[in-house]
């Protein structure tokens, strides 16, 4: 079996018993399965939620207000407990774990991004299992430093280390769809997804699982992003951790989001799954064709609308006229300058394009989805 690099994301509800306490027995099973995978010669990185839930076992805090302060206290206390439980479970398999806490802000600067990658590469080199969680103590929506849930963090890390496979372990058996039978409607697992379509998204239940931040839609969207980056991704039942090994052995489990075949350069990976976007550009049909079909840079004459305030060298998202996101790139001018060019062009009656021929986003600093 060819050696693979694997990311396993474990959801809060997978780690909890019905009473809300951590399921130590299940964590032990997970450690055993990961140890088995590693014995096959594969490298494994774990993304684990559950710090707030672990904190509830040790702290008596009034959470009625659901305040940021109470969540941060629980995360601070619970993260120490959570990593201790993991360390004890993996020690039984003679495996060392490392704790890594990250925020969205850690991925913004490419230098930091590369430092994270180098650390993870060295941990894997020395046969250590990195266990990563979002740093809930400093990652707040107010500071725009949070991922929102660990689903997106798992995709970013899988992209960062060049993972072959990404597993989302949840309390569902996979992405479910309704199917009409003689006995009535029933739910069946969607076994394979080739493209993330509106039909696929309609299968997602809109509710968020109790105890967690994300729901099925979050996982499906994250899986869709991962497969577009060339990573085979699975959503499956984490209460039966043997399923990961079953997939590794070629069996069908859960929902498989089939990886697209294209290769992505390191810099483009950072553009796609690292940098923090500061604004949005809406482009016309001609510019869309120039980018997608002719592989050209984006010029000012193709921009119809500028959203947000961004500076030269900031990252911006690109949308077409129908509101479909086309990609992301590094702007070679500030929003104020670009708006002024568009305004001047609208005011001129000569028919001559007065906008700069300098690219707004150079092809080398562009990632298209």
Predicted regions and their residues:
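C-terminal catalytic "cap/lid" subdomain
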Residues: 1-64, 68-96, 100-369
